[in-house]
Amino acid sequence: MRNPLLDRGSPAELADRGQVIDKKVELGTFARLTEAVATDLSSLATEHIPQKWRQAPVAIRLAFGWADDGRRFPTAEGRVAAHVPAVCQRCLGPLELNLDVDLKLLLAGPDQVAHATGDYELWEIDEATIRPLDILEEALIMAMPLSAMHGPGESCDTPGETVPTESADTVRPFADLRSRISGPAGDMEPDESE
């Protein structure tokens, strides 16, 4: 059975067929996104990395069609949604990003860019054929924040905000210094052991 996400075709062919892709796939299907997430998660301790995160579901709905009656401008409309693990750049702890991207794309070649019309976002195509998976993966990557952080009200302990507890084993080399300083001029009393 063919996978419409992986099959290459020209935007015009996909639009002529009225190709519709409505399915759930695993996050691991998107190689570049998975690589970026794995790199980010590598800074976490092993016990904080979510188990089986590559198997997280990604919901896809993508329909190809035409923007005009003259069939000059193929389009891709739909939505892609996924929960992607990340590292909070404030507390350096794990968090989950909710990526939900609505797509309304005009698939145009370099020679068609000047003629693009409508309320579609222009998606310039460099090759004669495309793979729907590549469009969806690029949309998810672009939806990821540059600096992922916990939202307001979420548990996020910024390093430096937490006060470390004092250990009984703490060595304080200057703790005795105050008792050795006497008088308003700050003259030091000689150590009697000398």
Regions found by a protein language model. Give the residues of each.
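Structured interface patches
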Residues: M1-E194
